[in-house]
């Protein structure tokens, strides 16, 4: 075989093998490592007490909900506290159990655990309004300045993701699981992509799913070998115990990041990385346990340390 034909044959073989192997292409990644670039809060300061939700804006400012002092805080890109708002109470912009936080280009969306609604603040932490919600909120993601998606809590109906406008009107919904599955078995974390599709991670089931905007399941995967959470009886309810997954997030490269729960190899530290078709590409381990993952647009990952006293920011390094 002469030189040019040999080179052509090798090129065709490489293309063929590449097409046949999952994970190769623009979403290919064999290893992910983290480099710490910022730490906010420590055992010997009062920057944070017990943070629950985090978000970041395009300018690098970081916003954090702190459950222990009932507040929403804004930090500059270097980690210095810029402003703080909120106090214990049930009035506008006040919290009893601050829990979830997300950001749109111009606004912040926060929840109080036992309030059926969403508090809206501008980026200067000025309270703007409360968006009513037909149910308590288990998870929240901003879809724009005037649109949010929530996982609605219900003991009777099916598990639902509701898309609300800025006045609380339901624009669409996805019923992703029948209530016959059991109490709390519909608990999820979710993240939307730019085309309106939703990626779901079930807290008490070994199940990761992708749904279309019109409510069709596109795929479903397990990552823990089909492990099942143990259940326990409390009064008349049978409740799940240990978590399978804790959170799910998207980067800007076509990767889905899933934080494992208590049933993962490294509990609350193992992160599974999938492509958008649900194929597992790699895993990595967080330095400390975390209750959530947050990825900003600059390809940074935020996670917890010191049982919620510390917020860590890491640069994601792809190999």
Regions found by a protein language model. Name each.
Residues 1-9:
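Bacterial N-terminal signal peptides that target proteins for export
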Residues 9-18:
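Bacterial N-terminal signal peptides
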Residues 19-319:
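Eukaryotic scaffold repeat domains enriched in small/polar residues
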